[in-house]
Amino acid sequence: QMGIWQTGKSLVYALGAGSSDQAWKGLFNINLTGKMQGNQFRIELKQKDARQRVGFDMGINLVMLDSAFTVSFFPMTPILGYSRWIVNADNKVTVYKDWKIDANLRMAYQNKLVSLQSLPDEGERTDRLQVEITGIDLKKLTEISPFLPDLSGILHTDLLLYTDRKTFGAEGNIGVNNLFYEEQRMGTLDLDLQYAGKDHLTDHAVDFELKIDSIRRAVVQG
């Protein structure tokens, strides 16, 4: 079901889709609502399974500017992966046309965390952005998305992104504890990464080491 109508200066829309309780991954009911006015867009998405459990309930405000766009998330207590999280009230992520990112976003639930935080410049390093992900259960994430394969494992990431004069850099660690893909165990993955891209990312320097179950499996330098 889909509907679009006008209320004052706003264009309002709603989209609903349902399926039987035999649907892939148990997806049963998905509702998308929102409105558009000028350069502002509001989107709300809610998903339930066959047992009427809410797997996802979250909204996004999007503002389009001449040389950037800004997104913020609501409410302060969204549901993600069947759990009720807390989002900082002043959350905001702005992406500029040169891909500079200004962010203040922190989503937390028990020992789980998704954080994007802009940091002050440090020497030649400017536009610093800390990306921190802790304790994310991939199984719950893939259960609410029909587009992802069946995965399980606990994701953690600690990355620093920055600009050093005309070089884009990234350094840190990405790991998954006890990763399973389509019910087949792949192991515990641990990737240490350093990357530098110059000349609009056409010139690359990469240094990474991949370990699986604490055994070094791949090393790339160059």
Residue ranges of predicted features:
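Interface amphipathic segments
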Residues: 1-222
